[in-house]
């Protein structure tokens, strides 16, 4: 029996060695594409700043960040014991916090045109709307969770059009976008699993672009797709690897958050500036960014999935 086990182990080792030397063990084509696009890029001229939270507050696993019209910073994190929603001023001073016991996996946070704050839970698929002071105003149960045994099987992000339409990225298991009216009544849904136009493999982020179209970070397909608010496919840019986020600045500058498929999650993250008319990559910042917010002055606020609250301010 010992000899047989040794033979089995030897065969496994030989197979693993063969795979590592073969195309099957090589980098996947998407990762090769991403590296070919990002490696030649210049680093963007920014200053890295780490904000100190005052009074001292332990941030744990920052999942998403948003900013509001007052320049405040809204952080959604995953504390072991504390409030997941924290509002700070631009200097890092805590203004208020809330949400303890209301979340399983806090995932997305956004501010709507009226200044209200919305959160998305990736485990329960519950979307919550809060007033700027933290009073709960609305709850949307997205539902239709295919496999409740999975920790991540729910919604990921939310976006708004100026006329009050709400779009939820129901991304981890359902590969769809669900539209609601301002009262939380479901209007329609669109999208399905796959690699073709209008198909997704993890709808990880959604945002309304300068022209009013919906831009979606199709994470595992390594691309951005964009659509009309009614769900009609308009186009796509494929960058390869994993594409976590897409964001626009107040002046229309476009950024995406990228990561190769074949390395640890703490390595080779980039926030990349992209020409919004062509999809050409223009420059990058080396930082992990699960989600991304952009301040009114163009500062980048990456959600680092750590306790570090960072911003990257453009140099004047």
Sequence positions of predicted segments:
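Eukaryotic scaffold repeat domains enriched in small/polar residues
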Residues: 27-316
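Bacterial N-terminal signal peptides that target proteins for export
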Residues: 2-13
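Initiator methionine at the very start of the polypeptide chain
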Residues: 1-2, 26
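Bacterial N-terminal signal peptides
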Residues: 11-22
